[in-house]
Amino acid sequence: MLERHDTLECLNQTSPLREKLVKTHMVLNNHLPFIKRIAVAIYDPKTSVLKTYLHSSGKEDPLSHYQTTIKDTPSLEALMKQGNPRIIKNKVTVERGRHEHTQRIGREGYAASYTLPMFYNGVFFGFIFFNSSETDAFNETTLEQLDLYGHLISLMVINEINSVQTLVAAISTASHMTHLRDPETGSHLDRMSRYARLIAKSLAEQYQLDDEYIERVFMFSPLHDIGKLGIPDQILLKPGKLTEEEQTIMRTHATKGREMIDNMLANFGFDSIPDVDILRNIAQFHHESINGQGYPAGLSGNSIPLEARIVAVADVFDALTSRRPYK
């Protein structure tokens, strides 16, 4: 019996999505060595914003931490509406592009590009970009191969995003029950999650954060107080100051949140979702303090997970800058 090594076996493993994209690019380069970059941008339908998400570049990517509204990029908006791919055949077209993202790509020396829109059951998710070092590289044979790899990458990305969204939806449903008891508004959670994303982006260079991490913080941050489901109403809804004993019970919501998330991950079979520890850390450690006086573990400084620090700042910032009459 002949044995053969599966060149894409990493796609069946729980490695981060970017590692899977890099490996896929390496396999593609065995056939199309002039493809020097594969990148994925995802679409936020609430804000009509297109955000960089993944790239296969071994170096610093020219479009890391970049976003734009779909209406500000008419050619991409047309692809979204029509569902068709786009070919830019030569460097002149790239260099003359008026949009910042096109100019950045041109300055990196990429000479041509092929863009595929991502759809799942008719719902638009974003784009896949194949950038070439050679002009006029996209003949029919090449395009057939890129279509195959593009759909593979699309399924890989959408499958992971759907898994994360299902997890977030499940926990959000439980979290909504909390907000029926504790009147934390959905607008507050939406604002603070976007503040968290802005903070993470501003720290990206200092902490070498990639777009995938930033998106996880954005998606998971509204779930920080899920543990309040385990707090009795007479404490959670008490209008006056809590007693010392009541404060002790209230502070257990951080640990309870971590326990609830662990149970949901196990029950839904989502333990293997990459970066799920970001969610665990946000729920458990968002009340820690830089000086070590927080809870539940009394962590201090850099021992507090970065995502928990980001969410804590975003939460407090919104509380201080928004009128919330129930507070």
Each predicted region: which residue ranges?
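Signal-transmission linkers at sensory-effector interfaces
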Residues: 1-22, 30, 163-173
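Helix-loop-beta substructure at the N-terminus of cytosolic sensory domains
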Residues: 11-53, 61-64, 199-213
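Short beta-strand-to-loop transition segments that serve as allosteric relay/switch motifs
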Residues: 58, 126-137, 239
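Regulatory sensory and allosteric helical modules in signal-transduction proteins
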Residues: 60-103
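Signal-transducing coupling segments at domain and membrane junctions
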Residues: 89-112, 289-299
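A short, aliphatic-rich beta-strand micro-motif
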Residues: 111-119
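Amphipathic alpha-helical "output/dimerization" segments
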Residues: 120, 137-158, 215, 306
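Histidine- and acidic-residue-rich, metal-dependent catalytic cores
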Residues: 169-327
